[in-house]
Amino acid sequence: MSKPIRVRYAPSPTGLLHIGNARTALFNYLYARRHGGTFIIRIEDTDRKRHVEDGERSQLENLKWLGMDWDESPETHENYRQSERLALYQQYIDQLLAEGKAYKSYVTEEELAAERERQEAAGETPRYINEFIGMSADEKAKYIAEREAAGIVPTVRLAVNESGIYKWTDMVKGDIEFEGGNIGGDWVIQKKDGYPTYNFAVVVDDHDMQISHVIRGDDHIANTPKQLMVYEALGWEAPEFGHMTLIINSETGKKLSKRDTNTLQFIEDYRKKGYMPEAVFNFIALLGWNPGGEEEIFSREQLIALFDENRLSKSPAAFDQKKMDWMSNEYLKHADFETVYALCKPFLEEAGRLTEKAEKLVELYKPQLKSADEIIPLTDLFFSDFPELTEAEKEVMAGETVSTVLQAFKAKLEAMSDEDFKPENIFPQIKAVQKETGIKGKNLFMPIRIAVSGEMHGPELPNTIYLLGRDKSIEHIKNML
């Protein structure tokens, strides 16, 4: 009988939720929901130097914003933060010490650095050399007594089986194998401050919480043999491991870096700019996984139903900001008006543009939006000075029929009554200019659009003219003549 599926996302509260960590959480979430398993949030907060105030709250809030829920977490369960589990770690440290599978190490940082320097100078791969090698029992006891008398606080190191082979069948990458002799020697499982190291604590946590599958980024592959050593030393069965490929920048082909200014990499950024969470969820789900076929827009429920861990990609996932923005635009275009207006409203309010025309403006530009904050630059025309024309726009306005078109259309607007000035009545006036002048197509529409809005492209022209107002539209046309 197979074990119940229990997976976890275990962030460190050391900053904002990065797109890579969000993907780890999302794939674990999809896997659990697809197979009727349990999705657990555990906080790995033992790195006190990097601890960020409010880091945990920020992580959880952004996961909730994306649309994820979980079954167990620090919000509902005790001891789901590593800092609350120190007694448990100590119990297993003491067990390994008593069994001779671990030992206290008194070597100092200065001695380690000097040895590393010597090894590098000799062209050797840096590794820890057991400080007790060649010592008799009496010499060892004397060494320890002298070190303790000098106030040196020991670490605890796991005794590595140098001839051991540590292998697993990875859910993504297939068979992977490491030799114990290539790990770097006996490694620290408890630091001088009494806190466990990551590779020790995570094993105790995963065993204690009965985690069945560990799905994470492939930057953790090198951690896995160390974790398998701890499972072996404690006599526990290891979970299955799956290591997702790196996320790379689609433009540079290199690993996604926080210095890549052409990408939005933190979930907080998407929230602040007014993206729909459903769009971000959909986009992240396709970073390193796809269900097959050409379709790319999926609801959360569809993604859960389609998720198949066997389709996790073995190739790096390309993060393409343009693709993200295309997908976001698809979601905003097809969302109901109330949803989009609610996203745009805070931006309009902050800019002092929450006027009686606000709803009409959102409706006008809804098909163009990639994020709600774009409503401000898109509506500048209605609240700011006429924009400076680009060279391409100036070239259009230098056309020989432009003056004829603008004079004729200005006359049509001037002849319209206030009662008749509505979007549905403006388009017939443009067609009337076409009939009178014989000018049509781009030579007709483009000069009017540029004269009124200062742009070659935009929403429906009659709607733009209506919301701008007759007087302002006429004023803009006059300025072009």
Curated annotation (Swiss-Prot):
Signal peptide: none
Keyword vocabulary terms for this entry: Aminoacyl-tRNA synthetase, ATP-binding, Cytoplasm, Ligase, Nucleotide-binding, Protein biosynthesis
Pfam families according to UniProt: Anticodon_2 (PF19269), tRNA-synt_1c (PF00749)
Keyword Chloroplast: no
Motif ('KMSKS' region): 255-259
UniProt-listed CDD domains: GluRS_core
Position of sequence motif 'HIGH' region: 11-21
Cellular component GO terms, alphabetical: cytosol
Any one GO molecular-function label of the UniProt entry: tRNA binding
Annotated compartments: Cytoplasm
A Gene Ontology biological process term: glutamyl-tRNA aminoacylation
Catalysed transformations (reactions): tRNA(Glu) + L-glutamate + ATP = L-glutamyl-tRNA(Glu) + AMP + diphosphate
EC number: 6.1.1.17
Binding site for ATP: 258
Function in brief: Catalyzes the attachment of glutamate to tRNA(Glu) in a two-step reaction: glutamate is first activated by ATP to form Glu-AMP and then transferred to the acceptor end of tRNA(Glu).
NCBIfam families, sorted: gltX_bact
Name of this protein: Glutamate--tRNA ligase
Annotated source species: Streptococcus pyogenes serotype M1
Gene behind the chain: gltX
